[in-house]
Amino acid sequence: MKKNIHPKWYKHSIVYGNGQQILTVGSTKPELHVEVWSSIHPFYTGSQKQLDTEGRIEKFMRKYGMK
């Protein structure tokens, strides 16, 4: 392997989310900051909200004056 061409590897990179330490991983950066992770994502917490949106077909029909 050639020397001095590979990035520095940190065995214990700390992942932060919302100001608190989430986990430790290996990375090319000493710290990682994330906005969304499984502890707060609506899919994993069960707090998903269903939006009351118009269906694609109805929107298409209305847009092109069909029906």
Swiss-Prot record:
Subcellular location(s) of the protein: Plastid, Chloroplast
UniProt keyword terms in alphabetical order: Chloroplast, Plastid, Ribonucleoprotein, Ribosomal protein, RNA-binding, rRNA-binding
Statement: the UniProt record of this protein carries the keyword Cell cycle: no
GO molecular function, one term: structural constituent of ribosome
Main location: plastid
Pfam families the record matches: Ribosomal_L31
Protein name: Large ribosomal subunit protein bL31c
One GO BP annotation of this record: translation
Signal sequence residues: none
Function per UniProt: Binds the 23S rRNA.
UniProt keyword Lipid biosynthesis, yes or no: no
Originating organism: Cyanidioschyzon merolae (strain NIES-3377 / 10D) (Unicellular red alga)
Domain of life of the organism encoding this protein: Eukaryota
Cellular component aspect of the GO annotation: chloroplast; ribonucleoprotein complex; ribosome
Assembly description: Part of the 50S ribosomal subunit.
Sequence similarity: Belongs to the bacterial ribosomal protein bL31 family. Type A subfamily.
